[in-house]
Amino acid sequence: MVHFIFVTGGVVSSLGKGLTAASLAMLLQAKGFRVSVRKLDPYLNIDPGTMNPHEHGEVYVTDDGAETDLDLGHYERFTGVSACKFDSITTGAIYSKLLKDERLGNYAGVTVQVIPHVTNIIKDFILSNTKGVDFIICEIGGTVGDIEGLPFFEAIRQIGNQLKSENCLFIHLTLLPYVKTARELKIKPTQHSVKALRAIGISPNILVCRAERHISKGAIDKISLLCNIKSEYVVPAIDQKNIYLVPIAYHNSGLDNKVLKFFNINIMPSKLDKWYDIINRLKDSNSKVRIAIIAKYHKLKDAYKSVIEALNHAGIYYKYKIDLVWTNAENLTEESINKKLLDIDGILVPGGFGERATKGKIIAIKYARTNNIPFFGICFGMQLATIEIAQNLIGIKDAVTEEFKVDGTKIIEKINKNCEDSKITIENVKKTMRLGSYPCSLVANTIAANAYKSLEINERHRHRYKFNNEFQNIFEKHGIVFSGFSKDEEIVEIIELPLLRWFVGVQFHPEFKSKPFEAHPLFIQFIKAAIEYNKCN
């Protein structure tokens, strides 16, 4: 029998529902249960694939090519279980299906309404694909009271009535703000949040209270009294210095055991050795390396969430703190770069779309190459690395990417050469995008092959352009090694400059497969090179 857990939020957004869901999933795994985590987003976009990072943050890509919310990255990193397209849905996707079915006559002429037709699609999503799991945790995006979220709350209310309490648990996450003048945590916002949730027919079984400091027993008892929840089911969620401390904090507060007790499941011991090892490594991380991220969205860290975490995973591996130096690529010039990248141990240019800030990124790549600073280029970062090499090392001064320039020598070209730019719209952009996991063959005795310790790998992709293979020979004559190719050898996946300390560009997104207990091999080697560079300088 599958048990369903719904995680909702109130008071404010960005409270950490995703981390709570991911942490609980991991804790249940540690007790031997099989867990699936899903995200339901109330926005009207079909998926976040074409959303501005300022609106949404990172687009997380799954193995099967779904473009999803960054919370799925948390789910994967904490549980080690790969997410898929069946783990994410939006209001836009729901209405798209609904309207398509209506046009096909699948509703047999009845009036199509939010209840029951929209809610039925939501329920079908939640209740489907349950084979082989013991728990399904569903995170509802947004906060209680949001207009766009009402169909989702109604759907899970109906599921709660349908499955009864023995198979359905509601966890509500709220904020206890600390008011300095009063010197106390305020409970009133939590009261109102629970009241709003009850007004739509849902009574939370567990209340998780986020706070920046210790919550006293008196405060917990007061919350219990005013929100009509047993005090043992009021769980404190105190701010942590590192997100990888969150699961153990929840374990210490008994969240996992409270869930099992609610479902009348025997409480079993937890196997948390690898997480305690992570905590110990974090405590032992006294040295640090400085990594510059040459970013287009330098003020929006969530746009590069998986990159940040992958760097931190490598730091955990070596017991090093990663000091990230966010560098605005738009403001980088040949004259300013020495000052802005002073005392840097490694330079990373992440993926992205659009022409803005490309000049600064190319300047940073040149700086890394000519000063022998460890460099890692990801997706667009690799493409710009080939353009920089073409312009400044090989001498192809008019080297360009076809993504932005029609005139010039096209070092980077479309994957689908038959697709005209005029035909590329939001409706068909996915048809021209190489999305999801693809196999890649590595060349023996290269940096990549030595890092992976294998000649066959699978990595996730999200790109429409690739290196123009016509230039492979001239690049090789100048010392560039092409160390990874797609299975059909049409797409260059990895480039290296072996004569430098560490200079690697990859067409894929390795950050999506990194875990805190299993750092990605390329990030491990990049940070290793940065540590060695730091020691030499």
From Swiss-Prot:
GO terms for biological process: 'de novo' CTP biosynthetic process; pyrimidine nucleobase biosynthetic process. It catalyses: UTP + L-glutamine + ATP + H2O = CTP + L-glutamate + ADP + phosphate + 2 H(+); L-glutamine + H2O = L-glutamate + NH4(+); UTP + NH4(+) + ATP = CTP + ADP + phosphate + 2 H(+). Its EC number is 6.3.4.2. GO terms for molecular function: ATP binding; CTP synthase activity; glutaminase activity; identical protein binding; metal ion binding. Pfam families: CTP_synth_N, GATase. Allosterically activated by GTP, when glutamine is the substrate; GTP has no effect on the reaction when ammonia is the substrate. The allosteric effector GTP functions by stabilizing the protein conformation that binds the tetrahedral intermediate(s) formed during glutamine hydrolysis. Inhibited by the product CTP, via allosteric rather than competitive inhibition. Pathway: Pyrimidine metabolism; CTP biosynthesis via de novo pathway; CTP from UDP: step 2/2. Coiled coil: none annotated. Residues 1-265 are annotated as: Amidoligase domain. CTP binds at residues 13, 146-148, 222. Keywords: ATP-binding, Glutamine amidotransferase, Ligase, Magnesium, Metal-binding, Nucleotide-binding, Pyrimidine biosynthesis. Residues 290-536 form the Glutamine amidotransferase type-1 domain. The keyword Calcium does not apply. The keyword Ligase applies. GO terms for cellular component: cytoophidium; cytoplasm. ATP binds at residues 14-19, 71. L-glutamine binds at residues 352, 380-383, 403, 464. Catalyzes the ATP-dependent amination of UTP to CTP with either L-glutamine or ammonia as the source of nitrogen. Regulates intracellular CTP levels through interactions with the four ribonucleotide triphosphates. CTPSs have evolved a hybrid strategy for distinguishing between UTP and CTP. The overlapping regions of the product feedback inhibitory and substrate sites recognize a common feature in both compounds, the triphosphate moiety. To differentiate isosteric substrate and product pyrimidine rings, an additional pocket far from the expected kinase/ligase catalytic site, specifically recognizes the cytosine and ribose portions of the product inhibitor. Homotetramer. This is CTP synthase. It comes from Rickettsia rickettsii (strain Sheila Smith). The gene is pyrG.
